[in-house]
Amino acid sequence: FRQIFPNLGWVEHNPEEIWKVTLRTIKEAIKKSKILKAKIISIGITNQRETTILWDKNTGKPVYNAIVWQDRRTNKICENLKKRKLENLFRNKTGLFIDPYFSATKVKWVLDNVSLSKKLIKNKRLMFGTIDTFLIWRLTDKTNHFTDATNASRTMMFNINSNQWDYEILKKLNIPKSIL
């Protein structure tokens, strides 16, 4: 799938392209392996852990392109968090430095800049995930919205000490826990 560069320092992917490539790859792998689909009991997903997608729970449509790990559009958000002296809080809870590389400030950017996200939050229809979460949700016919600790730990919203989403950090970023 293609990389999209809408502005200097911005890197995006089209989530629908990711989905189509994933389905095509699964079909090709099954065909080449010559095994019966009924014999498949599990699959593995490897992904760019910091790449961020938000989508509508009811329609499955992304509210914006996937914001890729290399994207630097949230530099100002990160600088603001540092000015608020939150570096130690984030580091102690997540093990990460405040940086646009991670998902948290990308989520905040979408919430602040994509008007549809606000409407969906009010209706409890907005969902967030890294690529694995988005693919799992779609592969399971919209029934499973989850990730694992290795992916969650790269979002800058996951407390590595308690092994769960950190509500204090979410509050500092104005990210509702309902989207997780």
Predicted features along the sequence, with ranges:
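Conserved A3 ("GATE") glycine/threonine-rich loop of ANL adenylate-forming enzymes
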Residues: 51, 61, 74-76, 104-105, ...
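Helix N-cap/coil-helix junction residues
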Residues: 35, 86, 174-175
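Active-site catalytic microenvironments for nucleophilic, acid-base chemistry
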Residues: 28, 32, 80, 113, ...
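Gly/Ser/Thr-rich active-site cleft segment
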Residues: 90-180
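Metal-dependent DNA phosphodiester-chemistry modules and their immediately adjacent helices/loops
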Residues: 82-88
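Carbohydrate-associated surface elements
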Residues: 71
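N-terminal glycine/serine-rich phosphate-binding loop of ATP-dependent small-molecule kinases
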Residues: 1-64, 76, 92
